[in-house]
Amino acid sequence: MKNSQLFFLRWLGWVFLLGTILTGSGFAGVASSDSIENRLRAILSEQAESIDLTSALLLISQDWNPSLNEVPLRTELARITESVRKRLSPSSSAKETVEALREVIHREGGYQYTDQVDARGIPLNPDELFLHGMLKSKRGYCMNLSLLYLIVGDRLNLPLHGVGLPNHFFVRYETENARINIEATESGVTFPDSFYENRFGVKFDPGTSFFTQNLNKRQTLGAYLSNVGMVHYRNSRLEKAIF
């Protein structure tokens, strides 16, 4: 890839990421049109804790594939959520909760990391970058596999957070008494912070503004949209590449 093209792709990703994170609720003034873009902007204008991850991600999928039928996708998400719910009780520990998620998503559901990715870890099959593609093929990459955890956590009010790293994303379960990193690309195995520090060359510093920190739902979607923008660009959808 020529240096100029690589620079543009990186710039495009950061436009998505920084625009979403730094503007916060700055999507005010949404037009009355019911377009997918405006519906997504309306969702992102909500308080971060009120954002419905499922609705946002399905809208992003519909923007890629307007003929998408979301009913079977919502049905699958409901099945996964209910299966996790049945394994939990009010007394479930952090480890038991993480094990329930791992069991349902990977062992029962069969969701795994796709082996068809580019040097950045982005799926070569563009559908597998989106929620709908992962739910159909049961193959995804670090971002949407993590998003599956976060959707279930959102529905069950579990203390799950997305965590961004350079060219990677994982899930963290965190309360006052427990902190567990969940690696969705390796069937939900848990790793200490030191594993990620060594592999990705970053320090888990509480003072860091983005990388290694627990992200809210708006920030998580911002990180995801950076990848979506690159996929639109690579597939010559330039009008969609800048949201």
Task: Spell out what each predicted region is.
Residues 2, 19-22, 219-222:
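Intrinsically disordered/low-complexity terminal segments and short unstructured peptides
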Residues 2-13:
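Bacterial N-terminal signal peptides that target proteins for export
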Residues 5-6, 23-26:
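Intrinsically disordered, low-complexity repeat segments enriched in small/polar residues
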Residues 11-24:
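Bacterial N-terminal signal peptides
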Residues 26-243:
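A structural boundary/capping signal
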